[in-house]
């Protein structure tokens, strides 16, 4: 079986080569920007390369061989990238571990990948690692990436500074040799996908995969060395990791946000031109804007909707290279001054493009952002495809789709309408799992995505649902839970939602409210309560949720509509295994943990 078509390209697009080239030509220009003690600090390309070489030499001093594994267990920070690329410079492999992973999840990855050195980002990750280190026989060293981490008297533990000092000029010849021997067929990473069932699988990606994506993104995107990109999604996920690689490949500035709660302030401070985000980010902004508009005087509401309408017409014409009538130009100038520019300021005022992935984006939300002049590029991809397979074109897209194919991506619709992918971006396979690797591909080498979908005549790709997640009610009706969850879950009062329907008489839902919004609402209605549990039992609160859910699900078929729901006082948790690090629901765990609440929704009076 032929797994994939390898890309024919030379070493010019090898990622490590691209970093070296940028460091040579952009010497004193800014490569990285990060926040320390409340101040943004810059690292020049020259200093960046020096730090990379220092760490590479230290890794060589610890006898790290070609294709050995180095793991990073940390939130985003500039040292994440430094560890990553220093590892790649010596032809070793980076294994990311989500900062939110439990000690047991980290232990599995460390042992399965035979990790030799682990870099930890903060005290919590260090403490978790100490819990399991004695169960990890291949682990030789735990390096604390911050000076604030308090180390125990443990032979494996060391500070960043002491580790760096172990490298010297004695390792320089070997570093030069490793750099000169780099191959596109080398693995650059093994990323463990946190499946909703079963143990994680290590996706093997090589430099040819990454080079393919660098090349196709060059053909598709307008990113220059003048751009500034703010990174706040985790580097342990292929979406932000591949994007960061592309930013460095283009010579743009990569900014780091370790505390995701500070994203709003970082947007106004950094004023980036580029930023990746997931649909939930846009949903929250959209809901907040609409909420503010609904509370505004009638005249302002009219002005807002008029401005959005004008923006929609203006950008539609511009996207299709059509002449913009004189009157519309004047209307747009006024709408932009009064409304649209102020909305763009919520994102810093300079955003020119925002890649979006990880889930489906509601069409109305995508259209809203495009109407105000924010170029959202919703994309589709997975770890196994080194991220992007398809994406929206600039201001020209079908809002219900996941875009058109990236250059050189080959996609067809297979059995059960499954989306099948082939091309240079597709993984080598799953680490130490030959059977699972074989099962992941068709006989002619297409990757099975597990997503059901279809194309329209214009080449737009649509996802209809996850094949394995279709639920069948006891009445024989098929339910697509993610579709219903995305419809209802966009409400400003809902933080998380899990649809229940498999083998049930009707659809029900477990809902975690957005307590910030809910408590503000309760305050407005003068609802008194001692704790959240009491608040969630309040009849006015229950009626409000029922009303809002019914309003949203009118467009759903009758058998798809939620008939009963239960409000939960605690969010679904990564620690408890209810959601994955990428925030996907682990339905089996949720069904078991909330069995009583679910049974109550079906054992009470008929819906």
Swiss-Prot record:
Any Pfam family the entry gives: AMP-binding
Classification via InterPro entries: AMP-binding_CS, AMP-dep_synth/lig_dom, ANL_N_sf
Enzyme class: ligase
Record's keyword terms, sorted: ATP-binding, Fatty acid metabolism, Ligase, Lipid metabolism, Nucleotide-binding
Reactions the enzyme catalyzes: a long-chain fatty acid + ATP + CoA = a long-chain fatty acyl-CoA + AMP + diphosphate
Superkingdom: Bacteria
PROSITE patterns: AMP_BINDING
Family: Belongs to the ATP-dependent AMP-binding enzyme family.
Record's protein name: Putative long-chain-fatty-acid--CoA ligase
Taxonomic lineage of the native organism: Bacteria, Pseudomonadati, Pseudomonadota, Gammaproteobacteria, Pasteurellales
């Amino acid at each position: 079986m032929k797994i994939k078509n390898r890309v024919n390209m030379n070493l010019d697009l090898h990622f490590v080569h691209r970093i070296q080239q940028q460091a040579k030509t952009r010497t004193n220009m800014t490569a990285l920007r990060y926040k320390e003690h409340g101040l943004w600090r810059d690292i020049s390309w020259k200093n960046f390369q020096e730090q990379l070489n220092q760490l590479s030499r230290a890794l060589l001093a610890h006898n790290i061989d070609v294709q050995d594994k180095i793991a990073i267990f940390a939130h985003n920070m500039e040292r994440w990238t430094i560890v990553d690329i220093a590892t790649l410079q010596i032809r070793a492999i980076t294994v990311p571990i989500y900062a939110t992973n439990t000690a047991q999840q980290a232990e599995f990855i460390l042992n399965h990948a035979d990790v030799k050195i682990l870099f930890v980002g903060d005290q919590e990750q260090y403490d978790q690692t100490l819990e399991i280190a004695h169960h990890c026989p291949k682990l030789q060293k735990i390096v604390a990436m911050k000076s604030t981490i308090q180390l125990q008297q443990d032979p494996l533990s060391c500070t960043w500074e002491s580790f760096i000092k172990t490298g010297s000029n004695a390792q320089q010849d070997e570093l030069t040799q490793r750099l000169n021997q780099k191959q596109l067929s080398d693995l650059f990473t093994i990323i463990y996908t946190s499946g909703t069932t079963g143990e994680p699988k290590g996706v093997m990606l090589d430099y040819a995969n990454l080079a393919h994506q660098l090349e196709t993104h060059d053909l598709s995107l307008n990113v220059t060395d003048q751009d500034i990109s703010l990174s706040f999604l985790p580097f342990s996920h292929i979406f932000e990791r591949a994007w960061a690689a592309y930013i460095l490949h283009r010579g743009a500035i990569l900014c780091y946000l370790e505390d995701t709660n500070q994203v709003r302030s970082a947007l106004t401070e950094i004023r980036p031109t580029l930023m990746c985000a997931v649909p939930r980010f846009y949903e929250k902004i959209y809901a907040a804007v609409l909420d503010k508009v609904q509370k505004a005087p009638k005249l302002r509401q009219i002005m807002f909707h008029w401005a959005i309408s004008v923006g929609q017409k203006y950008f539609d014409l511009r996207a299709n290279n059509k002449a913009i009538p004189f009157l519309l130009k004047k209307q747009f100038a006024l709408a932009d001054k009064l409304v649209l520019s102020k909305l763009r300021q919520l994102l810093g005022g300079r955003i020119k493009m925002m890649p979006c992935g990880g889930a489906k984006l509601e069409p109305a939300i995508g259209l809203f952002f495009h109407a105000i002049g924010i170029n959202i590029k919703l994309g589709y991809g997975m770890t196994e495809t080194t991220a992007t397979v398809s994406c929206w074109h600039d201001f020209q897209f079908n809002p219900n789709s996941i875009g058109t194919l990236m250059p050189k991506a080959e996609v067809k619709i297979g059995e059960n309408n499954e989306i099948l992918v082939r091309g240079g971006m597709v993984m080598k396979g799953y680490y130490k799992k030959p059977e699972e690797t074989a099962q992941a591909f068709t006989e002619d080498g297409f990757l099975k995505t597990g997503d059901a979908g279809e194309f329209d005549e214009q080449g737009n790709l649509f996802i209809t649902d996850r094949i394995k997640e279709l639920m069948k009610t006891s009445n024989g009706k098929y339910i697509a839970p993610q579709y219903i969850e995305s419809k209802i879950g966009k409400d400003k009062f809902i933080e998380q939602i899990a649809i229940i329907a498999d083998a049930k008489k009707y659809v029900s839902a477990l809902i975690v409210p957005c307590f910030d919004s809910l408590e503000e609402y309760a305050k407005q209605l003068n609802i008194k309560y001692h704790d959240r549990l009491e608040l969630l039992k309040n009849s006015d609160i229950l009626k409000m949720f029922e009303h809002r859910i019914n309003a949203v699900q009118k467009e759903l078929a009758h058998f798809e509509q939620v008939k009963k729901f239960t409000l939960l006082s605690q969010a679904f948790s990564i620690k408890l295994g209810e959601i994955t690090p990428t925030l996907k629901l682990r339905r089996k765990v949720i069904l078991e943990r909330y069995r009583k609440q679910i049974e109550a929704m079906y054992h009470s009076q008929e819906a």
